[in-house]
Amino acid sequence: MELDLIGGFKMPLAGGTLDVGLTWYMYPGGADNTDFAEPYVKLSGTAGPVNLLAGVAFAPKQEALGNFSNTPQSNGQSKHNLYLWGDASAGIPGTPVTAKAHIGYSDGNPGLGPNGTSVAPTGEYFDWMLGLDYVLGPVTLGAAYVDTDITNAEAAYLQPNFSSTKDGSSIASGKVLFSVTAAF
């Protein structure tokens, strides 16, 4: 299980919004030294009918981000992680549908950390998403295609930790995701 605690501050800036904060990633019941902190900065605004967001998150060197391979060299190793991303969304006129897109880049530990997990399992990779949201009152139905540029060979190196099912299929390949979100 992952529990994310987020604290930050938002303020208007040049017609947009600046959001500065910290995410603390916690893994209750996980191996020692799995929790880590990641400061972030996000700038959001609009360009015509399009909502835009750009962000950077940098987790400084921490043991939770190190390469844990059961070798003397990896014992107590600390690594950093950098994540850059951009999001765009726009409502489709005359409909309750919003089109959305995301692109991200991660640079960090080229291996698995505690609990066999990693925020950048291949050292660096790109991720992207294209999707649609359909609003029905307080409920939003979503469908999105998500993918990475992690190759099959890189994903195989990370098995079985990066498996989506018991048959060993990779979580790094493209998938269609469906979501239901309720706002109160």
Label every model-predicted segment.
Residues 25-83:
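Hydrophobic, well-structured mid-protein blocks that either form specific transmembrane helices
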Residues 118-119, 128-131:
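An amphipathic alpha-helical core segment
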Residues 134-137, 168-184:
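Outer-membrane beta-barrel "beta-signal"
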Residues 1-15, 19-35, 114, 121, ...:
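Surface-exposed loop and membrane-interface regions of Gram-negative outer-membrane beta-barrel proteins
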Residues 1, 30-37, 64-75, 106-123, ...:
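Outer-membrane beta-barrel translocator domains and adjoining extracellular loop/strand segments
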Residues 7, 20-22, 41, 52-56, ...:
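Membrane-embedded beta-strand positions of outer-membrane beta-barrel proteins
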Residues 1-3, 16, 33-39, 78-84, ...:
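Residues that define the transmembrane beta-barrel architecture of outer-membrane proteins
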Residues 11-13, 24-28, 45-49, 56-62, ...:
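Transmembrane beta-strands of outer-membrane beta-barrel pores
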